[in-house]
Curated annotation (Swiss-Prot):
Record's protein name: RNA pyrophosphohydrolase
Function: Accelerates the degradation of transcripts by removing pyrophosphate from the 5'-end of triphosphorylated RNA, leading to a more labile monophosphorylated state that can stimulate subsequent ribonuclease cleavage.
Record-linked Pfam families: NUDIX
Hydrolase in keyword set: yes
Gene: rppH
CDD domains assigned to the protein according to its UniProt record, in alphabetical order: NUDIX_Ap4A_hydrolase_plant_like (cd03671)
Length: 158
């Protein structure tokens, strides 16, 4: 039996992408039948810095390239979440207990037609812009505290 508390956190970068109207991008996860929505995020590759990873993940998940965004802020600290026990063996080969995430607030300077979630690394089956107050109820319960922290930190800048 694996002691989950001894597993490391997976290094990750995430993007709170805000449009010019102050609404935030969320995508509905493709790998589950539940109403699981989230902001773009993903692992940091070996030797990659968090900012480059965030821009890469944004492109892989939304088709938005770095020239269409302005970086407004970087989170003051890393955010952490733990997976529920029943998911630890199913995610990332059971090597991680959850994620430690560097987050970036980015302003989307493009048009909605620039967004294409049907990418080679498709993660989302649907997407939409939402008000900050809507985000928490869309997110899976084990990530809600993390998202509350992001909204508190980035909300005034959105």
């Amino acid at each position: 039996m694996i002691d989950h508390d001894k597993l490391p956190y997976r290094p990750c970068a995430g993007v709170m992408l805000a449009n010019r109207d102050g609404r935030v991008f969320v995508g509905q996860r493709l790998d589950t039948s539940s109403e699981a929505w989230q902001m773009p995020q993903g692992g940091i590759d070996e030797g990659e810095d968090a900012e480059k990873a965030a821009i890469r993940e944004l492109g892989e998940e939304t088709g938005i390239h770095g020239g269409l965004v302005d970086i407004i802020a970087r989170s003051r600290e890393e955010y952490f979440y733990d997976l529920p026990d029943h998911l630890i063996g199913k995610m990332w080969g059971g090597k991680y207990r959850g994620q430690r995430q560097h987050w970036f607030l980015m302003r989307f300077m493009g048009e909605d037609s620039d967004i294409d979630i049907h990418t080679r690394h498709q993660e989302f089956r649907a997407w939409r812009w939402v008000d900050l107050g809507e985000i928490e109820k869309l997110i899976v319960p084990f990530k809600r505290a993390l998202y509350r922290g992001l909204i508190e930190e980035f909300g005034p800048l959105v």
